[in-house]
């Protein structure tokens, strides 16, 4: 059955009728209607209307003057008290109608509004041409709570499904955070609670029932200015187009605050590899990525995000049906440049990722300091990397990474590991001495550091690491396990510098010797281990041999010592003679050999000398 509606209507007016001139009027019209229904959102409505209505049917003109409408509606959760005023003129012949000085004001009571109530004010001048199917909304002004908007709109084909419109809007400065609080709208948690306190907007607009386009967009958000063009097509399944420019923004202020880390070294050391191997990250939003339909570019003058500062950023996106291309990407950061291409494929069960990125002349220390809070490596960095992987979550993608790359750093330092100091400590322990205390920073300075790498299933392998410094020459090879965040690396360190180099004074006696160093541990806690024992053993063996020969020389005499040295060291002449191809002897050679046969050999002389000792 249809819901029941009860209504009471009262009508009072002075009626004027001139049939000859076809003039009709309702003066001092008063209409009161009271309606009740449990089926209506507002169960009770009381409408009062006052107006003077004049109609000239000869000229087909109708005028409604002194229009005043009051509507009072009450419901279980809402109450509305609204007033409407204006002048209505209708030309029935041309089908052009207008409402001049339209004023709508409403007091709304709702538990979801600030203080349980708010006020809405609307003013405008309307012109409608039903023959042309056009509607002009001029001098539009809307005020709700602390939000004020002005504008102008021209709509075409208003009686068909091909509605189109254009115009402009201006939103005066307002405090979005306060407005949301007043309307009891919960905003996402942000690192800076002073954000969203200034918002201002102006734009040219156009569109249809299923589209909205902005041109000459100017949006102020706190200290940031966004300009350009933005469009949405198909509101049910939106497709976005844009060409935007943002002067500057500190995005970290709008992101959730960083969680405080509980410092528990034991738990950290145990959980870092294990948690990475277990892969506890949440699944990637593949369905959301598939729904992205966007094409455009965003240029940013200055950007701070995740602590990283960059300038002149270019982000270009082309995304549709699960294929997302971010190309080209570009930025200037830390005195260098970044260029890259990123491709995402979310059409399958796993997200496929492919990156091709390049860094040139970037100061690695300040970059890492801002990004992680720890500048593990400093210097001017150049790098290129091509990687691809797939998975349902970040950990799975790490475990599937494949590709290659190259890197180089100049005039920098490896921080958290002082190779020279590690060698000094090992040397002191093996010598039974205590290493001298030092105030040197825990870092290894270098003039250049370079290498290439390959990635296979998340394991990054490098075979040609080369580090050069005034004191050290380092070569290395090994693996970095990205999923487990652990290091397994072997380097060979050669002391080449003078006493003026980093720690050079106490290492001068190791100059020219190559020392193996094993580096293991986690990303947060790399542990170098110097195998100096084998090196010192080899060095000591050589020194003992040299001293023994010297003692023999002192006791046996220079002549015998020299002979013994020749025998211990080998006779190069005899070796050469053995390898020389024999030729027929001449008569002169035969005579010389006969004479030399009568002279004692070096071996005979050595034997005679040894006999004389005993």
PLM regions: where:
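Extended, low-complexity, charged intrinsically disordered regions
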Residues: 53, 88-90, 276-281
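Surface-exposed acidic, glycine/proline-enriched linker/cap segments
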Residues: 267-285, 430-442
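Protein-protein interaction and targeting regions used for scaffolding, dimerization, and localization
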Residues: 532-614
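Small-residue helix/turn framework positions
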Residues: 2-12, 21-50, 54, 59-81, ...
């Amino acid at each position: 059955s249809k819901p029941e509606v009860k209504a009471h209507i009262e009508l009072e007016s002075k009626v004027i009728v001139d049939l000859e001139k076809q003039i009709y009027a309702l003066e001092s019209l008063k209409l009161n209607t009271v309606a009740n229904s449990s089926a209506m959102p507002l169960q009770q409505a009381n409408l009062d209307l006052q107006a003077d209505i004049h109609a000239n049917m000869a000229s087909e003109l109708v005028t409604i003057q002194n229009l005043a409408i009051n509507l009072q509606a009450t419901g279980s959760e809402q109450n509305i008290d609204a007033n409407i005023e204006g002048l209505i003129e209708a030309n029935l012949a041309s089908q052009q109608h207008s409402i001049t000085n339209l004023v709508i004001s409403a007091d709304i009571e709702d538990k979801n509004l600030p203080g349980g109530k708010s006020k809405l004010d609307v003013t405008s001048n309307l012109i409608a041409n039903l023959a042309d199917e056009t509607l002009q909304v001029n001098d539009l002004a809307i005020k709700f709570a602390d939000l004020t908007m002005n504008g102008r709109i021209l709509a075409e084909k208003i009686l068909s499904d091909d509605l189109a419109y254009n115009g402009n809007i201006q939103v005066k400065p307002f405090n979005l955070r306060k407005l949301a609080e007043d309307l009891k709208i919960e905003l996402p948690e942000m690192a800076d609670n002073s954000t969203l306190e200034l918002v201002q907007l102006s734009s040219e607009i156009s569109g249809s029932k299923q589209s909205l386009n902005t041109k000459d967009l100017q949006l102020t958000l706190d200290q940031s200015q966004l300009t350009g063009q933005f469009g949405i097509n198909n509101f049910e399944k939106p497709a976005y187009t844009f060409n935007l420019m943002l002067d500057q923004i500190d995005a970290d202020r709008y992101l959730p605050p960083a969680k405080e880390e509980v410092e528990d070294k034991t738990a950290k050391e145990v959980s870092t590899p294990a948690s990475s191997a277990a892969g506890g990250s949440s699944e990637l939003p593949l369905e959301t990525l598939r729904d992205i339909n966007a094409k455009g570019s965003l240029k940013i003058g200055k950007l701070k995000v995740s602590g990283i500062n960059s300038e002149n950023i270019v982000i270009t996106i082309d995304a549709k049906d699960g294929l997302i291309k971010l190309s080209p990407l570009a930025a200037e950061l830390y005195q260098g440049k970044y260029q890259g291409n990123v491709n995402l494929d979310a059409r399958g069960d796993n997200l496929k990722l492919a990156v091709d990125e390049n860094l040139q002349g970037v100061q690695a220390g300040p970059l890492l300091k801002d990004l992680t809070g720890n500048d593990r490596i400093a210097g001017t960095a150049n790098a290129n990397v091509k990687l691809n992987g797939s998975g349902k979550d970040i950990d799975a993608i790490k475990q599937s990474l494949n590709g290659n790359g190259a890197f180089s750093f100049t005039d920098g330092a490896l921080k958290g590991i002082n190779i020279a100091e590690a060698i000094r400590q090992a040397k002191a322990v093996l010598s039974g001495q205590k290493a001298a205390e030092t105030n040197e920073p825990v870092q290894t300075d270098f003039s250049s550091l370079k290498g290439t790498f390959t990635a296979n299933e998340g394991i990054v392998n490098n075979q040609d690491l080369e580090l050069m410094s005034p004191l050290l020459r380092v070569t290395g090879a090994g693996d970095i396990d990205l999923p487990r965040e652990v290091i397994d690396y072997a380097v060979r360190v050669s002391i080449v510098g003078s006493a003026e180099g980093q720690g050079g004074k106490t290492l001068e006696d190791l100059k020219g010797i190559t020392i193996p160093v094993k580096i293991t541990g986690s990303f947060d806690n790399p542990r170098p281990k110097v195998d100096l024992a084998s090196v010192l053993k080899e060095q000591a063996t050589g020194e003992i041999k040299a001293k023994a020969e010297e003692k023999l020389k002192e006791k046996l005499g220079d002549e015998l010592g020299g002979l013994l040295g020749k025998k211990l060291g080998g006779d190069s002449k005899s070796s050469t003679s053995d390898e020389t191809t024999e030729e027929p002897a001449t008569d002169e050679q035969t005579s010389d050999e006969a004479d030399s046969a009568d002279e004692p050999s070096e071996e005979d002389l050595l034997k005679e000398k040894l006999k004389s000792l005993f």
